[in-house]
Amino acid sequence: MQVLPPGSTGGPSRLFILRPVATTLLMAAILLAGIIGYRFLPVAALPEVDYPTIQVVTLYPGASPDVMTSAVTAPLERQFGQMSGLKQMSSQSSGGASVVTLQFQLTLPLDVAEQEVQAAINAATNLLPSDLPNPPIYSKVNPADPPIMTLAVTSNAMPMTQVEDMVETRVAQKISQVSGVGLVTLAGGQRPAVRVKLNAQAVAALGLTSETVRTAITGANVNSAKGSLDGPERAVTLSANDQMQSADEYRRLIIAYQNGAPVRLGDVATVEQGAENSWLGAWANQAPAIVMNVQRQPGANIIATADSIRQMLPQLTESLPKSVKVTVLSDRTTNIRASVRDTQFELMLAIALVVMIIYLFLRNIPATIIPGVAVPLSLIGTFAVMVFLDFSINNLTLMALTIATGFVVDDAIVVIENISRYIEKGEKPLAAALKGAGEIGFTIISLTFSLIAVLIPLLFMGDIVGRLFREFAVTLAVAILISAVVSLTLTPMMCARMLSQQSLRKQNRFSRACERMFDRVIASYGRGLAKVLNHPWLTLSVAFATLLLSVMLWIVIPKGFFPVQDNGIIQGTLQAPQSSSYASMAQRQRQVAERILQDPAVQSLTTFVGVDGANPTLNSARLQINLKPLDARDDRVQQVISRLQTAVATIPGVALYLQPTQDLTIDTQVSRTQYQFTLQATTLDALSHWVPKLQNALQSLPQLSEVSSDWQDRGLAAWVNVDRDSASRLGISMADVDNALYNAFGQRLISTIYTQANQYRVVLEHNTASTPGLAALETIRLTSRDGGTVPLSAIARIEQRFAPLSINHLDQFPVTTFSFNVPEGYSLGDAVQAILDTEKTLALPADITTQFQGSTLAFQAALGSTVWLIVAAVVAMYIVLGVLYESFIHPITILSTLPTAGVGALLALIIAGSELDIIAIIGIILLIGIVKKNAIMMIDFALAAEREQGMSPRDAIFQACLLRFRPILMTTLAALLGALPLMLSTGVGAELRRPLGIAMVGGLLVSQVLTLFTTPVIYLLFDRLSLYVKSRFPRHKEEA
């Protein structure tokens, strides 16, 4: 595209100035498209950047962590490891549960990943234990992603088993069908079952064994095909009373005969209706409850999903008895909506402040209306493009539009100011519009494309950070582009019809006072600039010192990854001694819950104890603390966490780890604290040697707090050491021993009761109430070759040992995850460096590897690419400016203003006590685009004066600085006030917005002062350099 030079009559704006109706209709079309687009845009907390993640859960009640690892997890991992597109595979194998989490590359569609996972499970089926109660179940959900909604179902009249049955069949299934729902889990799921508790003494007295009982039950309760009779006239279906449905029927079941008399199950066992797993429990505000956690699919629209669930709830609750109460304990969308509302308010406030600044400078209602129309038009038109690109209304896109407020008004200000200058000189409005727009058209194009060039590197950022800021960068670029179009079309057309000498000269007392103030400021600036031009080397020294100071501040400033948000929900892990039982954990959680609910900021609490897909070991409990709305509590979430941990610290035998939930979830497992670091080895023995050493070293670091690990190798285990020779002589196999132990202590699911709506289990176990602990093993009896029974103690010796409570793998190798927080006064960058230094000090062997995980790993990657990102932005700007100016020298002059922005931004962050995180870095990159606009406006007019008026470079730059001082000040203040609401934000999600505002306001304040003086000096320096090069190399005809 050939750009018309300054001074032409109208340039690209001529057609639009002369055709006001067409221009008006074109702008109306943009406005209408934007309004329609806004109605179709979904609302979210952040852009969708989730990794495709699938969780595979396999439950095998009674199996030890060793058995789960070797028999279940390892076969699955071998198949999963062959899948293409797999980024990371982690697993947890604990008592009775195996959880494998598969994280795929961002580019792999979730549906494709799902198909590969299903195929891998099918391939591993033959390698899994034949008596698994259920096959592996996969869910399209990230287990570390907090639930979008938590519901508690309670009843003061019904047992939890009946409540759970109704919730599972009437509520959970329906919610699972909602589009966007990835998984509905029932914490504390007390599924109904018939529990058979054998009396070991009674069984032994009759010469029976638990295996005899199990065989009798499984043979008496079947549900299989029986065929049909097909006669000449009628067909008859065969059925029988082969199913037993109630505990009473099982109680009357004959399991053997003694001396001709029947022995019924009720004679040797307590048979009752109970729960399938008696070691699971959940509480809502200390009341027993079934807690429903609803998690979304990766990439699903969280707002739409939550709205669909809420619309469905009234109908679902009507199907439940009156005594059953369903309560929404938490809804993440409440805070998301509040955060978006606050950001929308800050956007409107930014628009109002920008318009106010325009009026302050122009002091003219018609001249203020013109940019007052251009700004919302540019922003609203952006919504149409956002819909086309499948974007959403989220915190980042709204932040982009808020920042764009200061950007988009710049173009209108530059056009209006230039046209007004000619009208004030006596030219007709139409002629002034043609001349002023033509003169400034090239400047607008330069400003626009050089600013968009700054955003280009953001589009090429890799991994999740790049995905996160793609919507931000594109939204801002589109708003700037539409603004340029509006400023070259609608703005000059409105100036030609709304501005006049009378309106511009019409002044009141306030206008005259402002004019005198601006005249004095410009005069003072002119005197200061003359002195600076007379002492160029001093000014250059200041510019060089600014560059050095920028580098120094960059090195020393604390660095972080992503601001910690206050979303009103706290996730917690309660840790107890490794040998803790379910009963002791239930008691501990009651004590902890009582302390937590006493805090004035807490609204509700859910706790869960037991082993399932979310909680790996019995000595840990999961908590979710829901806080009151931000405006209803005095403290932020970190203060509440500190207070809760202090309150619980006096309870003996527990450690409470708390962290606020975040909108951005990168981890694949629920951790105790915010940051993770892994230690991986080829064997468990190697891990057991190095874990204590590394943990002790990390705990001694002042840069880390709350250091813990998931390494638990001190769980109590009873080792049954069988004398194989003695067992063989008696005709007892190891399978017989395993079956006897499993029957007694594994809550073994031995049979299934089928109904029209659901299936229920028959659970076999020993009644250990009279013989607790290891003494229960002495009651185990086995059938010998001659049909008699033999006590287990006759062929085995019982030893008490320590064993792992869980075995964790990362990409099929044993791993331990260290969790830590960063104490006040230190940054994540400090903690990462301290860990790396500690690793070097310990001199780990080659077969031991370490790696950061989750947000810490993303922080490392982002930190390594940040400098290159800024360099890429500068290079992109240089290329664009070089093309526009057809010069190698002038772009360097423009870019020389950038260090001043860096100094201001970094100083502001340090003074405000903020870290240099990803949000602040984006602010610095945007500053690069804003600050150079000052230089562009100066240099454009200086070059035009040299070319058209024959002025010397010094006179030309001096005149350009004075002429462009007012629009430079206006545009800078507009950008500053566009960012000011973000800096001062205090509502929901303010932690996310504030670093961007602080960086931009600080950078603009410092750069505005310095660039007004350094740019003309550097311009003259490079002009002399250009003349020197031409004199030394006269054959080179390139224009510098």
UniProtKB/Swiss-Prot annotation:
GO terms for cellular component: plasma membrane. It is a multi-pass membrane protein. GO terms for molecular function: xenobiotic transmembrane transporter activity. The chain crosses the membrane at residues 25-45, 347-367, 369-389, 396-416, 440-460, 472-492, 537-557, 863-883, 888-908, 910-930, 968-988, 998-1018. NCBIfam families: PRK10503.1 (NF007798), RND_permease_2 (NF033617). Belongs to the resistance-nodulation-cell division (RND) (TC 2.A.6) family. MdtB subfamily. This is Multidrug resistance protein MdtB. It comes from Salmonella heidelberg (strain SL476).
